[in-house]
């Protein structure tokens, strides 16, 4: 883009229009949406802060755009000079403005994706453009299985109704956007979608324009920064809000679409309401691994809160159902029940309901039955509320629902009766939707998983054995531990009494088990043991559950994360299955969790991905040998560095036979908003998971050939070696990492309740995977994603040039390898080593500059080798739409990168001299108050010069929005 053209451009959206490819399809509204939102925002910025500040925003954007054109580092310096000349208040406003513009760009993109999707559905075109790499549609999957793969419709239906996808919401601290802003973003999205509807009237348009202006201004006027860290209860409430807003209604709507898709392949049955197609679990308030803020009291609170929320949502729907169920014809079975209830209800207290507040006559039998359901739901909700507030309730247990079977029974009775009286069409309306909600969400809304480190259980058992004076459990061999645990599990005597000496940590573990015993069993899902390495880790949890009187013990799930643990996992699980007591206990079913984050941090992405692939194959073979059905629980993050990527591609690239209709997967942090933030996103997410799980089971991907395996094994060794050589053995690395990235400042964002380190001191090993990825994402260098790939590819090609052809063939024909390469290519497209070079120049000591240069040379070499294997000349050659979307963001992100680098310089070096130009934000009528200065007052206790800390945090949030992930 020539400089003279840039000088003539009046606004940012004019530059955006220059980025439009020569030919854009009619349904491509992205530029239009983007420009509309930005025009509105820049007008708001001018109204609030004056023309001078708006011009500074445009000047920064233009310098960034010039840099993006030629990657001339001088442009970054010019941009840095503009940004460092701003006074503290203006600096905050500029960082906030660019962060806000990136959020608006994301919203424009989401509306555009939904628009393209609708266009495709209208055309009946599912395989258009990028859909092959981003979508997995249930109807298209059914048609593909029946018509292309010659599966019978009955086979498809049978596989579908027996499959389960369990989505596990976790409070991983990667959601950097406050809930207050997420809600405003949702309203902006709605306004934008409605503005581009075909049948909009002029009055509608005017009102929507006003609403859009109002919401954009409200979002900009909201403090983006969390001033205090969230508690686990805050995280749980935030996670559960998605159920209230989209998931609750989204599940029956999705299942109705599945019914329609089945009808279109010739199946005239509906998916049974109790078929477990979709289930939801949570770690919010249950994941205590490294988080001291998750206490037994927190676990109890979140379970009761979820129960109260579930009862409240059912209660709010039951009167609508009563209105619909006005029929008088019913089966004898239902009539007898209705008459009994009518007689007994006259003696009960009358509750002051809004509708049906008087006793329902027996001539409306369905309403009588549902009226009793309403009473019990009311009591269920109130009892949970009392227990939450006061620990006791005077509502007797017999007047509430304590398990889901009690709740389903009267609803099933109504359904059977309607069908028996020829009213199936009515039964299959709202009543079926309600039954499906009850079957999906139960009384607990989600099932809470408990996660704890194996060492904490060892501490408890060591205290017990020392108290019993039989030795130190911690010092026993694995054989001796197993022998003692099995002997105790087979016996009946209590293992310890109230006189057991307890440290605070031991009491915490035991009190957690007591909470499991106290609350209804349907509150809980799995008990996950992190850092599990041997059968005794699993048996220890079984014994502690028994000793604490957990009536229905939770299934125990070992979690294997690091490379060595993944390699040893199949043997460990085989030893576990060899124990007769345990084999009888699990009834032919076992779950194993595999961790993507820590394995990547431990060995690099290539080696971790390959070891995760092999571990799954071997674990499935072990399970088959012992006659056990194994469910894999995938602990995937949102970023590629932590196992993220498009959902259906991730599923379809898993090894054959490793899913077979049963899948658990974590949905973490910002991914929850991206997957469930809107109704259409929720619908699309449920489609992707269900369709891809079905397709993987009925049309498994190919197995790798022996020569591919051998090459992958060799390359993984080299990749791990180079990765560890640099990350763990290179003496300069830790210092370089801490200086070149904002890792040390990450904790100031107050994203999550969990500390960023497992141990307060220590190096890279003790750093959690999220801040590790976060730090490199902020500098757009993405080192954890690509490091090791270059060494592996170079070794393979130099060893034998034929290996290049083999790698190219693997890319074309093997889904696992293709997905692995494509995701790294996407990360390279988001990367920019020029930003890393600027950080080095400003923040890193001169003696480390050569080290930074060698890493950037490695980056370029790896990128070129990757393109050669993919057969691409340029990054994202095969996905021009994604490339366009990323280009639209680059200039905003670059401004924030430069702002961040110079702000870090000023924070870390208080002697760094800058010269402020005059204050440019306009003043209010009274001269003492400047709007930009008001921002400084939001953080009066900062330990740095005024405005620096907030400017830094705003750049972090903006870059996270631009990269569309945090950690």
Curated annotation (Swiss-Prot):
D-glucose 6-phosphate binds at residues 283, 451, 598, 636, 666, 754, 768-770. The active site is at 172, 601, 642. Keywords: Carbon dioxide fixation, Cytoplasm, Lyase, Magnesium, Phosphoprotein. Its main location: cytoplasm. The modification Phosphoserine is found at residue 11. Expressed in roots and stems and at low levels in leaves. It comes from the Eukaryota. It is found in: Cytoplasm. GO terms for cellular component: apoplast; chloroplast; cytosol. It catalyses: oxaloacetate + phosphate = phosphoenolpyruvate + hydrogencarbonate. L-aspartate binds at residues 642, 674, 830, 889, 965. Activated by the allosteric regulator glucose-6-phosphate. Inhibited by malate and aspartate. Up regulated by light-reversible phosphorylation. Pfam families: PEPcase. It is an enzyme of class 4 (lyase). The keyword Phosphoprotein applies. Its EC number is 4.1.1.31. HAMAP family: PEPcase_type1. Homotetramer. Through the carboxylation of phosphoenolpyruvate (PEP) it forms oxaloacetate, a four-carbon dicarboxylic acid source for the tricarboxylic acid cycle. Belongs to the PEPCase type 1 family. NCBIfam families: PRK00009.1. This is Phosphoenolpyruvate carboxylase 2. It comes from Flaveria trinervia (Clustered yellowtops).
